[in-house]
Amino acid sequence: MTPEFANDLKASVRAIPDYPKPGIIFRDITTLLGEPRAFRRAIDELVQPWAGSKIDKVAGIEARGFIIGGAIAHQVSSGFVPIRKKGKLPHTCVSMEYALEYGTDKIEVHVDAITPGERVILVDDLIATGGTAEGAIKLLRQIGAEVVAACFVIDLPELGGAAKIRAMGVPVRTLVAFEGH
C-alpha cells in the first residue's frame, strides 16, 4: 500500500469526538464505505496477502465487520459467517464471553457455521483493545476453525489489540493507524 493511499484512506474516515462518551474519538468508516473507489481499494488491500490462498470462510464481527467481511468473502470466493451479539442468531449457537472495558459481553455463532479444519479470516472495521476479536477467535477455534488471519481497516495501536491477537498466533492485517482511543 502506498503512503498516498494510506493518507487518502485516513482522510476518508470521519472522526467524531466525544462519542460514545467524553474523551473518545469515534472512527466512523461509513464515509469510507460511501466512497466506491476508497471502499474497493480498502478491500483489495485487506485481501492482498491471501490472494490465491485457500480461504474457506470469512467471519465478520457485528455490525461493520459484516460489511467489510462480506466484501472480502466475495473477493476470495469464500462463504461468510456472522458473529453476532447474544440472542441474534436463529439456530443453535455456541457463545463466548469476552471482556469489555467495564464488564463482559457475549458473542455467538451458529454451531454448524464452520466445518472443523476450515481456514477462516476474521474481520472487523477497527481493533482497539482486542477483546471482541480475542473472543471471536476463541469462539471460532471452539467450533473447529483454523483462524489464519484477522483483518481490520483501522488499528488503535496504543490500546494493544493487534499485539494481543498476534500473541494468539494469528497474523493481523490493518490498513491505517490512529493515535488515541
UniProtKB/Swiss-Prot annotation:
<dbReference type="GO" id="GO:0006166">
    <property type="term" value="P:purine ribonucleoside salvage"/>
</dbReference>
<dbReference type="GO" id="GO:0002055">
    <property type="term" value="F:adenine binding"/>
</dbReference>
<comment type="pathway">
    <text>Purine metabolism; AMP biosynthesis via salvage pathway; AMP from adenine: step 1/1.</text>
</comment>
<dbReference type="InterPro" id="IPR005764">
    <property type="entry name" value="Ade_phspho_trans"/>
</dbReference>
<keyword id="KW-0963">Cytoplasm</keyword>
<comment type="subunit">
    <text>Homodimer.</text>
</comment>
<dbReference type="Pfam" id="PF00156">
    <property type="entry name" value="Pribosyltran"/>
</dbReference>
<keyword id="KW-0660">Purine salvage</keyword>
<dbReference type="InterPro" id="IPR000836">
    <property type="entry name" value="PRibTrfase_dom"/>
</dbReference>
<keyword id="KW-0328">Glycosyltransferase</keyword>
<dbReference type="GO" id="GO:0016208">
    <property type="term" value="F:AMP binding"/>
</dbReference>
<dbReference type="GO" id="GO:0006168">
    <property type="term" value="P:adenine salvage"/>
</dbReference>
<comment type="similarity">
    <text>Belongs to the purine/pyrimidine phosphoribosyltransferase family.</text>
</comment>
<dbReference type="InterPro" id="IPR029057">
    <property type="entry name" value="PRTase-like"/>
</dbReference>
<keyword id="KW-0808">Transferase</keyword>
<dbReference type="InterPro" id="IPR050054">
    <property type="entry name" value="UPRTase/APRTase"/>
</dbReference>
<dbReference type="GO" id="GO:0003999">
    <property type="term" value="F:adenine phosphoribosyltransferase activity"/>
</dbReference>
<comment type="function">
    <text>Catalyzes a salvage reaction resulting in the formation of AMP, that is energically less costly than de novo synthesis.</text>
</comment>
<protein>
    <recommendedName>
        <fullName>Adenine phosphoribosyltransferase</fullName>
        <ecNumber>2.4.2.7</ecNumber>
    </recommendedName>
</protein>
<dbReference type="GO" id="GO:0005737">
    <property type="term" value="C:cytoplasm"/>
</dbReference>
<dbReference type="GO" id="GO:0044209">
    <property type="term" value="P:AMP salvage"/>
</dbReference>
